[in-house]
Amino acid sequence: LRNFRKKNQKTVFLQHGIIKDNLSHGIDASVAGMDMFVTSASREQQAVIERHGYTSESCILTGLCRFDNLPLEHSVKSKQILIMPTFRHWIMAANGTYATKEEKEKFVSDEFCQMYNKLLSSKRLKETLEKYDYILVFYPHYCVQPFLECFQDAKRTERVILASNKDYDVQRLLIESDMLITDFSSIFFDFAYMKKPEAFFQFDEEKYRGGHYEE
């Protein structure tokens, strides 16, 4: 980032979520050299100071505004389970919002797509949702949204919804859902903040940690 600054320009690092992975290659003071680093939790602030070389004066604790509207009590049961996996950099659409035929073919052949199609179309899942009268909403990371149509197997049951970011609001889904299933996404902090149950589906942890983000 140093190469993109104007002379004497001050830079502030704002986050979209709490840091949980090793991002030293991009945020270390020796690399990015931010004048101010905004953190969301006291333990995160401590980690940024101790691990990434920022001073207590330059690393400030403000909280995270995306938590402000999250209720601390979940009194109404919605009978809804939310699945929100994060993206994999090796199967992203170059365009960002539209996937080409070739990119979709690569995506469909990847373990990520195959495992979620298998899960979403599971007979056991369908029977369980019907037994307990639950709806399952599948809302993948926005980088996966261009491939939403690749999860066609999920359409075998009306109890599974493929949620597009054009039609569904992330925070509303988080608030309304009774349970979250994710993988390596920091979205689990939002659900933990609301003290609601979570489960982790990490079938490709070794590949993810080896070629995406280190823990």
Which residues does each PLM region occupy?
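Conserved catalytic-core segment of nucleotide-activated headgroup transferases in glycan assembly
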Residues: 65-152
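A short, gly/pro- and small-residue-rich
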Residues: 2-18, 100-109, 195-207
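Donor nucleotide-activated moiety binding/catalytic core segment of transferases
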Residues: 143-189
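Catalytic binding pocket for nucleotide-activated donors in carbohydrate/polymer assembly enzymes
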Residues: 55-56, 155, 186-215
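Active-site and donor-binding regions of nucleotide-sugar-utilizing enzymes
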Residues: 1-71
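Structural motif
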Residues: 10, 36, 80, 135, ...
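Structural alpha-helical scaffold elements that stabilize or flank donor/cofactor-binding regions
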Residues: 4, 30, 128, 172-173
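Helix N-cap/beta->alpha junction signal
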Residues: 40-43, 140-142, 184
